[in-house]
Amino acid sequence: EAGPGDPGLTTILTGARGTGKTALLSYLADEASSRGWVAVNVSALPGMLDEILQQTLRNSSHLIERKGAFKLSGIKVADLAEIQFQSADNDHPTWRIRMEEALGQLAEADAGLLITVDEVREDLDEMVQLASVFQHFVRDRRRVALFMAGLPTHVNGLLQNKSVSFLRRANFHELGVVSDFDIEQAMRKTIEDGGRGV
């Protein structure tokens, strides 16, 4: 990582089914975690943005403080006891504002956030919203990365959307078919690393 704004921090993987896109996203998330980043992994499905926020808060709970959900608003003693609570968050902040708060707390802990999105779909409004908001995170020099993977037709469809022109400057990698020899070598190494022989 060269720092906030590094073009490699926005990466799109494409390839046919079975070329290892999901496995590579998982590997990259594990690698980021081993370097002190918080990694969240989602699929492009409805509810994806909330899932990103919830995973960010959960996976960084050792680094950031969650705001209280309720506050005491009144106590009544006459006619027995009565206690009233109300939501501490009356203003209902947007997804972007809640993510900026989390990113700010992560920055204070000297940690970054990697968001991985698998099975990119051009027909999901939340994909467009994520890409649009992510460019603001980059412009604000947040320590954040976005790695996405999908079939070429879906990725190309997403890139045609006028609202995500930022993604057209992403780092692209097209994954090809893995040869039988490479598969054999990887399996052999995995088995031998596990203390077994072939």
Tell me what each language-model feature is.
Residues 18, 45-49, 122, 151-156, ...:
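Conserved nucleotide-binding/hydrolysis micro-motifs of P-loop NTPases
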Residues 160-176:
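A short helix-turn-beta junction within AAA+ P-loop NTPase domains corresponding to the substrate/partner-engaging
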Residues 5-27:
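Walker A/P-loop nucleotide-binding motif
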Residues 33-39, 49-85:
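Conserved NTP-binding/hydrolysis module of P-loop NTPases
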Residues 88-163:
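Conserved Walker B catalytic segment
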Residues 175-198:
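Conserved small helical "lid"/interfacial subdomain of P-loop NTPases
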Residues 11-14, 29-48:
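Conserved catalytic segments around the Walker B and adjacent sensor/switch elements
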